[in-house]
Amino acid sequence: MIGKLKGILEHIFDDHIIVNVQGVGYVVFISNRLRPSLPALGESLSLFIETHVREEAIRLFGFIAKAEQEWFCLLQNVPGVGAKVALAILGTLSPDELAQAIALNDIAMISRAPGVGKKVSERIVSELKSKALPFSEKVIHSAPLPHLEVTNQPTNDALSALIKLGFERDQAARALALAVNALEGETVSSALLIRHSLKLLSPPT
């Protein structure tokens, strides 16, 4: 099983590259997001590798970041999501963006990936919601992931307010997800969500 490749980038094609490792050319499938990060032809390249062994072929999938490789594997645990769909999702969303979309139940964001419809996106959120937060920064790893509706007005209002206060969208979304989890069972208003989110976003004193 190949876990990592380090070699010379020899060729770039639409959906894969060829990496020369000590005279052996390896075909490695990549996402669209990885392409702009590739070095020039003839230069050194290092990739995390996920190996798929099938009866008809052995396929290698390459990733610059370990988190991308981990999400690639997680996505394929969802019924209806194979390597092609998982790679399409990671070609559209970064690991942080994907974790944020799942945390906020943002079906539309996941559906931006080519070949990914609403039903598959809903299944991804349902199956992987407990996996999303550990991939984000500043996360309470023991906290269960809340299931948020992007159509929920207090949630949308709170997210907009936090962004207007100067926080990045991904930071605000993570804090908001944790705030909703902490307030589970209470009558939640946008003001209450904002207060709890600000506590999470405030630097420790």
From Swiss-Prot:
Annotated source species: Bartonella henselae (strain ATCC 49882 / DSM 28221 / CCUG 30454 / Houston 1) (Rochalimaea henselae)
Domain notes: Has three domains with a flexible linker between the domains II and III and assumes an 'L' shape. Domain III is highly mobile and contacts RuvB.
Main location: cytoplasm
GO cellular component, one term: Holliday junction helicase complex
SMART domains recorded: HhH1
Protein localization: Cytoplasm
Region (Domain II): 65-143
This protein's name: Holliday junction branch migration complex subunit RuvA
Cross-referenced InterPro entries: DNA_helicase_Holl-junc_RuvA_I (IPR013849), Hlx-hairpin-Hlx_DNA-bd_motif (IPR003583), NA-bd_OB-fold (IPR012340), RuvA (IPR000085), RuvA_2-like (IPR010994), RuvA_C (IPR011114), RuvA_C_sf (IPR036267)
GO MF annotations, alphabetized: ATP binding; four-way junction DNA binding; four-way junction helicase activity
